């Protein structure tokens, strides 16, 4: 009987830890996606006023001031992410940026929504989503 109590306490601790990790990750994902959406929106608006070359200029400056990770292709992906959301794709916070990158090449909104739903329903890791 005593053995069972220890087990339950250990199990509860581990379950609570798993829940915390997921909440923490979802919070992190939500923030990251929100930031990338906002950056994409600003890039889209800046592009209308200053032309496509603005992404190259911003990329150069951001890389100098903040560091790597803000290359031209990444900034273009952020803009593409914003444009997809604006077309009506609802992106749940469970998806990581890697998941988003896997669906960005898809042009059909229904296909995008399909892959988002199977990603969540089947809890697909990024690599498995990319294979589909």
Task: Give the residues covered by each predicted segment.
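Basic, low-complexity intrinsically disordered segments
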Residues: 1-132
């Amino acid at each position: 009987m005593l053995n069972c109590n220890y087990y339950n306490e250990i199990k509860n601790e581990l379950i609570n830890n798993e829940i915390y990790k997921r909440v923490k990750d979802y919070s992190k994902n939500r923030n990251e996606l929100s930031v990338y959406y906002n950056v994409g929106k600003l890039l889209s608006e800046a592009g209308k006023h200053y032309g496509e070359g603005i992404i190259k200029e911003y990329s150069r400056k951001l890389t100098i001031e903040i560091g790597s990770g803000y290359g031209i292709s990444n900034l273009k992906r952020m803009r593409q992410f914003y444009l997809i959301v604006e077309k009506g794709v609802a992106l749940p916070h469970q998806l990581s940026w890697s998941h988003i990158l896997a669906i960005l090449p898809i042009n059909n909104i229904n296909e995008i929504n399909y892959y988002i739903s199977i990603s969540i329903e089947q809890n697909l890791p990024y690599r498995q989503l990319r294979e589909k």
